[in-house]
Amino acid sequence: MPAVLGFEGSANKIGVGVVRDGTVLANPRRTYVTAPGTGFLPGDTARHHRAVILDLLQEALTEAGLTPKDIDCIAYTKGPGMGAPLASVAVVARTVAQLWNKPLLGVNHCIGHIEMGRLITGAVNPTVLYVSGGNTQVISYSEHRYRIFGETIDIAVGNCLDRFARVLKISNDPSPGYNIEQMAKRGKKLVELPYTVKGMDVSFSGILSFIEDAAQRMLATGECTPEDLCFSLQETVFAMLVEITERAMAHCGSKEALIVGGVGCNVRLQEMMATMCQERGAQLFATDERFCIDNGAMIAQAGWEMFQAGHRTPLQDSGITQRYRTDEVEVTWRD
């Protein structure tokens, strides 16, 4: 029964997880939180990760009840993500693999999300909506690849929400997206915003520019409240995501939809997706914040699948790739 230890640190979350044969044994995580109205810089984020990663490693082993000799493989996020945080975590993964004399596996971050989602929900062959701060893709598996049927042509949906949170000076604790979600629940007025869908692709830069420009004016005149703007932004961008997911499901003949990525925690997005799936006679699968948000266990799970399929990453190839496409990986562990 192989046990895989996974390191995740592609953005402002740092996690170390342990998975053994489909069971999550440990999944501790820390978040780098910045002041309201600000984002997180790669260098500062990397310093945060370096400061806590060894404590997280010990915490994961203790929680799992394992010692280094019980670990069969070390997996880490190869990309995509922010360069400095990725590199910092990769150095630790390489060092641990050499110290413990374990094989190493570089894992695609998106595939980590998908494999964890499939494990936790039991979805067999879903159309995947992958939504996070850095990525927005609609994906389906075909012929040993996770094929991208649609994606953002500019910024990710999570980035759109996070940047609007800065305009309103919304707290980044626990995350700007979560706080926008709570404010949106109190919104009562739907403000018309740009809606940009191009086939199975979406664009969020236009709606962000529009609402950034209009927010101060509309708030100053009393035309709407901050809660109304959060509600309107959520409803509009989520409608775009539901539309392209449904189009991909129709194209693939899929009866399953799986939401992964940090934005996938949003209850309103899950409600809208569930309505679409119900109307199509399909089933929606989603996870909670333990597994939607970036975590080490998802890297361990994808690493476990790859390890079982015979994958290994030679030390000389164990770098990082900031723009690591989902469909670049040959998925040999699926039929």
Curated annotation (Swiss-Prot):
Note on cofactor: Binds 1 divalent metal cation per subunit.
Gene Ontology CC entries for this record: cytoplasm; cytosol; EKC/KEOPS complex; nucleoplasm; nucleus
GO terms under biological process: tRNA modification; tRNA threonylcarbamoyladenosine modification
Cellular location(s): Cytoplasm; Nucleus
SUPFAM superfamilies per UniProt: Actin-like ATPase domain (SSF53067)
Catalytic reaction equation(s): L-threonylcarbamoyladenylate + adenosine(37) in tRNA = N(6)-L-threonylcarbamoyladenosine(37) in tRNA + AMP + H(+)
Binding residues annotated for substrate, in chain numbering: Y130, V131, S132, G133, G134, D162, G177, E181, N266
InterPro entries xrefs: ATPase_NBD (IPR043129), Gcp-like_dom (IPR000905), KAE1/TsaD (IPR017861), Kae1_archaea_euk (IPR034680), Peptidase_M22_CS (IPR017860)
An example Gene Ontology molecular-function term: metal ion binding
Residues annotated for a divalent metal cation binding in this entry: H109, H113, Y130, D294
The keyword Transferase belongs to this UniProt entry's keyword annotation: yes
Top-level EC class: transferase
Broad class of where this protein is predominantly found: cytoplasm
Cofactors that this protein relies on: a divalent metal cation
Keywords: Acyltransferase, Cytoplasm, Metal-binding, Nucleus, Transferase, tRNA processing
EC number: 2.3.1.234
Role according to the record: Component of the EKC/KEOPS complex that is required for the formation of a threonylcarbamoyl group on adenosine at position 37 (t(6)A37) in tRNAs that read codons beginning with adenine. The complex is probably involved in the transfer of the threonylcarbamoyl moiety of threonylcarbamoyl-AMP (TC-AMP) to the N6 group of A37. OSGEP likely plays a direct catalytic role in this reaction, but requires other protein(s) of the complex to fulfill this activity.
Family stated for the protein in its record: Belongs to the KAE1 / TsaD family.
Subunit: Component of the EKC/KEOPS complex composed of at least GON7, TP53RK, TPRKB, OSGEP and LAGE3; the whole complex dimerizes.
Matches recorded under HAMAP family: Kae1
Protein name: tRNA N6-adenosine threonylcarbamoyltransferase
Gene that specifies this protein: Osgep
